[in-house]
């Protein structure tokens, strides 16, 4: 109203713009001179001005708002703006802080704009709710500047420097959140500016290569939005939230810091946390709490709570040994009795020869002990009647234990039904193989208590491979080794120097009169990634880049069957311990179950989100274990094809698996040098073992008793672990500390630093018993024989 009057007065030339105080004096003078129209208009302006003191209401609103803004009372300022029903005064570009005189500009000095009408404050123009650190209003242009590509690097650098300078009690938890924030900032930056995204990735990605090297390598090629859709890791991060476990104190500390620095990058980090992270707030962060951290890949049926995983790990499983055919058992016992009688006669003839020595158990007793762990007969009496009495008493004892402790016993340790897995009828070859197993078991080295002088490892080094060897496997009788190469060949060697030709088979070739100790198998058209011998050592399986699996005869050294079904390269193959069946793992994210007499898969195990890298059978043959690049391990029921266990906890792809001979425990090795030990019945992790540094673990193997584990990896070492240590089971390690074979931690660390440098050296856990170093030979395969002899093999790489 007063602005329009001042404008009219300027146009008529009657008055010049004056300060408010002088304008009130002139109005009084005009009234005395008798100018009635001007007196009425000036009277109205005077009445409005006096209603709110020396300033108009709009001036007071502007002054109060600027005062609240200057003092930082933004919440009060917003409430005043929201509840005020008056028109919004135009914002003055000069704030009270920048005026030299300290006086507020007068209302009349504001340039008029009669073409535009003032809008109510409920819908103000050019009004932003964002303010900088000093309380100044942030314009829309500044808001866009905060999301500029160059600010991503500044925001992440600010957070990284703050985490690095935090107190040690908070730094571990804060460092865990850096990785998902880095990934999501990078993916957002790819969509905005690929050039800055590449600069951001190259600058900060080395911080995560030690523990997330596989994912970092996969994200290296992401340079556009189309790449994000095609890349498995990037699409998984984009479509799922990342679960991170933090304490409430640490989360509050982080959010307070980001709110304080909201205008210089904190808002970017806050938006990432709000949109892409799923904080799991706990009182104190433990290793068990962090097992489920990572990308939340949950189906609709899980309702976002992960309940299906818990229900899956509670599904009853039968981990006991597979029941034997009664008629076949009788045949074995009859044959063993004959062998025992022959040994008894031989001992009587050579009375001076102490045959029993350290092992005074008959073959029949050993066979009973193999099938019943409760039977432990160490007496030297070979009388048949006493043997029968002992067996009868043992059976009665077993029945009584089952009655008394039936409720206490774990139902997961019961044996599966025999008809759940169809098997071909037994042959004379199977009978011969079982007798050989009993003999080897009786003569096995006992590792119940590790002695101060550990048994050595028999290491086979393959020379002149030109870095083409890709896999290796030993037969169960440790007589043959088979290796796959990148030029699609398979080579087999005789480890004991005997001929590979079967004397009972006449071969129509030029080598029939010779005794070859090495053979080459030709048939694949791509790199051979895995080989596996059958339990009877008569057949060999091979998986290749050409998407096929081939079955080879060790008698004729020819290919018998080619199994086609996978859509991508086959990474791993494994024969069932019962024979007849085998499993494969492939790049097509599936594992498959096959039988030797069918050219199509019997089961397809689908559920992994990335490559299935390794596969192994349970000792009873009724379950299959798979390790994947999605950092998980799964247990599958052969009879139904369902996933019955999900093992979460690795931070890198799982590339090696081994199952304890008693079927209770599972060990998994990953690309980052971590070995996890799991309880299969509960699906929980028992412990974590470190010692291979940050190098991949290629192979794992259990001893006959299941208390010792050996591992081989890319760090050119074979390491021996005491599995019972730091668990509820009795330890196999002696009370006296082991010093030899670089077994003590100090010597092992010093040797690791000498070999690989400090950057790739990790302090080993206390369950590391011994370390065996090679000369630049990655250990592709480790294996405990049935006699507890440790074998290892690899290709020398100068």
From Swiss-Prot:
SUBUNIT field: Component of the 1.8 MDa SAGA (Spt-Ada-Gcn5 acetyltransferase) complex, which is composed of 19 subunits TRA1, SPT7, TAF5, NGG1/ADA3, SGF73, SPT20/ADA5, SPT8, TAF12, TAF6, HFI1/ADA1, UBP8, GCN5, ADA2, SPT3, SGF29, TAF10, TAF9, SGF11 and SUS1.
Polar residues bias spans: 1-25, 86-110
Skewed-composition ranges (Low complexity): 26-53
Keywords: Coiled coil, Nucleus, Phosphoprotein, Repeat, Transcription, Transcription regulation, WD repeat
Coiled coil: 329-349
Source superkingdom: Eukaryota
Species for this entry: Saccharomyces cerevisiae (strain ATCC 204508 / S288c) (Baker's yeast)
The family this protein is said to belong to: Belongs to the WD repeat TAF5 family.
Xref: Pfam families: LisH, TFIID_NTD2, WD40
Location relative to the cell: Nucleus
Protein name, UniProt field: SAGA complex/transcription factor TFIID complex subunit TAF5
Region (Disordered): 1-57, 82-134, 371-421
GO molecular function: chromatin binding; identical protein binding; molecular adaptor activity; ubiquitin binding
Note in the entry: Present with 14834 (+/-203) molecules/cell in log phase SD medium.
Domain LisH, first and last residues per copy: 56-88
Residues in WD repeats: 464-503, 523-562, 565-604, 607-646, 649-688, 692-731
Free-text note on domains in this protein's UniProt record: The C-terminal WD40 motifs are required for its incorporation into TFIID and function in SAGA.
SMART domains according to UniProt: LisH, WD40
GO biological process terms held by the UniProt record: chromatin organization; positive regulation of transcription by RNA polymerase II; regulation of transcription by RNA polymerase II; transcription by RNA polymerase II; transcription initiation at RNA polymerase II promoter
């Amino acid at each position: 109203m007063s602005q329009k009057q001042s404008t009219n007065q300027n146009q008529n030339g009657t008055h010049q713009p004056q300060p408010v105080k002088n304008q009130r004096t002139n109005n009084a003078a005009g009234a005395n001179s008798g100018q009635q129209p001007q007196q009425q208009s000036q009277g109205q302006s005077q009445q409005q001005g006096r209603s709110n003191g020396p300033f108009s209401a709009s001036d007071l609103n502007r002054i109060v708002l600027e005062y609240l803004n200057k003092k930082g009372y933004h919440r009060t300022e917003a409430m005043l703006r929201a509840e005020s029903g008056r028109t919004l005064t135009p914002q003055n570009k000069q704030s009270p802080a920048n005026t030299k005189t300290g006086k507020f500009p007068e209302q009349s000095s504001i340039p008029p704009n009669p073409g535009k009408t003032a809008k109510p404050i409920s819908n103000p123009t050019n009004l932003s709710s964002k303010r900088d650190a000093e309380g100044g209003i942030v314009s829309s242009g500044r808001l866009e500047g905060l999301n500029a590509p160059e600010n991503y690097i500044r925001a992440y650098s600010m957070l990284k420097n703050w985490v690095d300078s935090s107190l040690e009690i908070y730094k571990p938890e804060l460092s865990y959140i850096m990785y998902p924030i880095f990934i999501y900032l990078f993916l957002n930056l790819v969509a905005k500016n690929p050039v800055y995204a590449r600069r951001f990735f190259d600058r900060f990605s080395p911080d995560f290569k030690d523990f997330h090297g596989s994912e970092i390598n996969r994200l290296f090629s992401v340079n556009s939005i189309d790449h994000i859709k095609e890349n498995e890791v990037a699409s998984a991060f984009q479509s799922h939230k990342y679960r991170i476990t933090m304490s409430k104190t640490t989360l509050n500390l982080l959010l307070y810091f980001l709110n304080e620095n909201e205008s210089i990058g904190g808002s970017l980090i806050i938006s990432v946390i709000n949109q892409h992270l799923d904080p799991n707030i706990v009182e104190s962060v433990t290793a068990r709490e962090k097992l489920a951290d990572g990308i939340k890949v949950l189906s609709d049926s899980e309702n976002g709570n992960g309940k299906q995983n818990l229900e899956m790990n509670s599904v009853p499983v039968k981990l006991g040994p597979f029941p034997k055919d009664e008629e076949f058992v009788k045949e074995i016992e009859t044959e063993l009795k004959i062998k025992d009688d022959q040994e008894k006669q031989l001992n009587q003839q050579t009375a001076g020869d102490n045959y029993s020595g350290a092992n005074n158990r008959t073959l029949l007793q050993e066979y009973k002990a193999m099938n019943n762990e409760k039977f432990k007969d160490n007496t030297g009496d070979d009388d048949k009647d006493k043997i029968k009495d002992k067996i009868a008493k043992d059976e009665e004892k077993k029945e009584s234990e089952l009655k008394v402790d039936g409720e206490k016993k774990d139902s997961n340790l019961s044996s599966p039904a025999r008809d759940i897995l169809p098997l071909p009828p037994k042959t004379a070859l199977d009978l011969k193989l079982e007798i050989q197993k009993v003999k080897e078991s009786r003569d096995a080295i006992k590792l119940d208590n590790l002695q101060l002088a550990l048994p050595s490892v028999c290491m086979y080094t393959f020379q002149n491979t030109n870095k083409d060897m890709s896999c290796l496997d030993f037969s169960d009788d440790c007589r043959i080794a088979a290796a796959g190469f990148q030029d699609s060949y398979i080579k087999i060697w005789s480890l004991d120097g005997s001929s590979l030709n079967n004397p009972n088979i006449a071969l129509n070739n030029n080598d029939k009169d010779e005794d070859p100790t090495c053979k080459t198998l030709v048939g694949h058209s791509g790199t051979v990634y895995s080989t596996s011998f059958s339990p009877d050592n008569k057949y060999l399986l091979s998986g290749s880049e050409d998407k096929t699996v081939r079955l080879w005869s060790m008698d004729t050294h020819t290919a018998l069957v080619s199994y086609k079904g996978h859509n991508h390269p086959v990474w791993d193959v494994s024969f069932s311990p019962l024979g007849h069946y085998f499993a494969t793992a492939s790049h097509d994210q599936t594992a498959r179950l096959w039988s030797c007499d069918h050219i199509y898969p019997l089961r397809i195990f689908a559920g992994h989100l990335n490559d299935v890298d390794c596969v192994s059978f349970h000792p009873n043959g009724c379950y299959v274990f798979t390790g994947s690049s999605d950092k998980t391990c799964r247990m599958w029921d052969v009879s139904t094809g369902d996933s019955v266990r999900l093992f979460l906890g690795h931070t890198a792809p799982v590339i090696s698996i081994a199952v304890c001979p008693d079927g209770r425990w599972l060990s998994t090795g990953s690309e980052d040098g971590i070995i996890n030990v799991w309880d299969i019945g509960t699906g929980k992790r028992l412990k974590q073992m470190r010692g291979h540094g940050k190098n991949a673990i290629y192979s794992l193997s259990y001893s006959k008793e299941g208390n010792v584990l050996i591992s081989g990896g890319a760090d050119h070492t074979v390491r021996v672990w005491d599995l019972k240590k730091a668990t509820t089971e009795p330890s196999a390690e002696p009370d006296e500390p082991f010093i030899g074979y670089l077994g003590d931690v100090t010597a092992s660390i010093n040797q690791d630093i000498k070999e690989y440098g400090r950057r790739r050296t990790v302090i080993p856990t206390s369950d590391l018993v011994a370390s065996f170093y090679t000369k630049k030979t990655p250990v592709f395969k480790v294996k405990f024989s049935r006699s507890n002899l440790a074998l290892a093999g690899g290709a020398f790489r100068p």
